Amino acid sequence: MDALSEANGTFALTLLKKLGEGNSKNVFISPLSISSALAMVLLGAKGNTAAQMCQTLSLNKSSGGGEDVHQGFQNLLSEVNRRDTQYLLRTANRLFGEKTYDFLSSFKDSCHKFYQAEMEELDFVSATEQSRKHINTWVAEKTEGKIRDLLPANSVNPMTRLVLVNAIYFKGNWDTQFNKEHTEERPFRVSKNVEKPVQMMFKKSTCKITYIGEISTQILVLPYVGQELNMVILLPSESTDLNTVEKALTYEKFIAWTKPDVMDEEEVEVFLPRFTLEESYDMEEFLQELGMTDAFEETRADFSGMSSGRGLHLSKVMHKSFVEVTEEGTEAAAATGAVVMMRCLMVVPRFNANHPFLFFIQHSKTGAILFCGRFCSP
């Protein structure tokens, strides 16, 4: 599980940086959702196509995309989807294949075994629009209606052979909630000279907090009820640019900076905006920039592990995500060196997220990053 968590974590941060490159827009994704969906495709990929996918997903360290990668995903997904939790978290994967196309039963069996994913056959050739709507309805059901139109108009056509969909939905309450009476409009500094109003929540509670000198950033951990999931927030100091923090951030550092022995547990005054983000990404371009090119090219893609037919290639990888952070908690959906804290006696540390920050929703036991984002502008 550890090699896989590291691979997924590395992929998560690579993607977070890529999607936010050179601009100050909000980003929200579920890296777990995206990587598990692509790992399903990897089951049917061979040769260079598979090698590029492993590279992009950072899986080359952990056994090069062999069976144990998929075994790792199976373990991780069953751990994450456990029913006996105090939060609601559901992931769902499905393959929608053109019904006239012959997919290998070994591929379908593996998808079912490792990813609990069924292959559903649709008529993309003559019922293109109905097929698209059918897929969107499935996603909406799996995300409690939060993700409605995953596939926009014209995203599938009569040449579509395979659409692979992942959906993830999360709803959790804070371990200690924010008091609604304390929420008030306050300014959020979008950039040096621009401020926008936000509904700023406030609570004073015992939290894990630390200060990372090398990037001048406070890190706060806000647990959800049951302590199995946390929101980890990286808030740079007023004078530090968020891009600087992103550039310095690696998965190894993320783990090192949030280790229990680096964190202080103390009473903190927390100011956090109430926010909702809804983002939609056409992933092809980003994945190609990360080196996964062959999978999208009809003449180069090798998916002979899926079908003996020729010309099978990925045409679309859509990801849509939703998060709502309120006083009670968070609702999210998506579809895929020693650090010394300066201590001052009797001063309650203040964590005031009134300027851009990064946030992660992490599964404590496995370390998996379920969701991550950057909040730059209300």
Swiss-Prot record:
* PROSITE patterns xrefs: SERPIN
Q: Could you say which residues are annotated as the site Reactive bond? A: 343-344
Q: Pfam families in the record, alphabetically?
A: Serpin
Q: Which residues carry this modification: N-acetylmethionine?
A: 1
Q: What is its main location?
A: cytoplasm
- SMART domains xrefs: SERPIN (SM00093)
Localization per record: Cytoplasm
The signal peptide, as residue positions, is none
Cite the entry's keywords alphabetically: Acetylation, Cytoplasm, Protease inhibitor, Serine protease inhibitor
- InterPro entries listed in its UniProt record: Serpin_CS (IPR023795), Serpin_dom (IPR023796), Serpin_fam (IPR000215), Serpin_sf (IPR036186), Serpin_sf_1 (IPR042178), Serpin_sf_2 (IPR042185)
Reported tissue expression:
Brain.
Q: Name one GO cellular component term.
A: cytoplasm
Chain positions found as N6-acetyllysine: 196
Q: GO molecular function terms here?
A: serine-type endopeptidase inhibitor activity
Report the function annotation for this chain.
Answer: Inhibitor of cathepsin G, kallikrein-8 and thrombin. May play an important role in the inner ear in the protection against leakage of lysosomal content during stress. May be involved in the regulation of serine proteinases present in the brain or extravasated from the blood.
Oligomeric form and interacting partners: Forms a complex with the monomeric form of beta-tryptase.
What family is this?
Answer: Belongs to the serpin family. Ov-serpin subfamily.
Q: What is this protein called?
A: Serpin B6
The organism's lineage? Eukaryota, Metazoa, Chordata, Craniata, Vertebrata
Its gene name is SERPINB6
